[in-house]
Regions:
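Regulatory hinge/linker segments at domain boundaries
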Residues: 2-23, 81, 85-88
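Basic, Lys/Arg-enriched C-terminal extension of HTH/homeodomain DNA-binding domains
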Residues: 10, 58-91
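Pre-recognition alpha-helix immediately N-terminal to the DNA-recognition helix
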Residues: 23-24, 67
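Conserved catalytic core of two-component sensor histidine kinases
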Residues: 19, 26, 50
Length: 91
């Protein structure tokens, strides 16, 4: 068994460890939105977005946004839904 295969089976499922709001923030980050865009979309402050992202990193055991997004995508994230609807983001 390769090391990569072992690491993949040990990945935490974000849906199991994150709150619904943390998952929503992570999904929007995965779409490439900035903290300001996420804050605007969710009607919260940029500070609140940063707070949620810090909790995401801690709960998933990652150290940055890219690692969190990769983990979310590897565990079946972004299947659709309100958080992934970008129609209101088109200029």
């Amino acid at each position: 068994m390769s090391h990569g295969a072992v690491a993949e089976t040990e990945l935490p499922d974000p849906r199991a460890v994150l709150s619904p709001r943390e998952l929503e923030v992570l999904d929007l980050a995965a779409l490439g939105l900035t903290n300001l865009q996420i804050a605007t979309r969710l009607h919260v402050t940029v500070h609140a977005v940063k707070f949620h992202l810090a909790a995401v990193y801690r709960k998933l055991g990652v150290s940055n946004r890219t690692e969190a997004v990769v983990l979310r995508l590897r565990t079946g994230g972004l299947a659709g839904g309100a958080a992934t609807d970008t129609t209101d983001l088109v200029a």
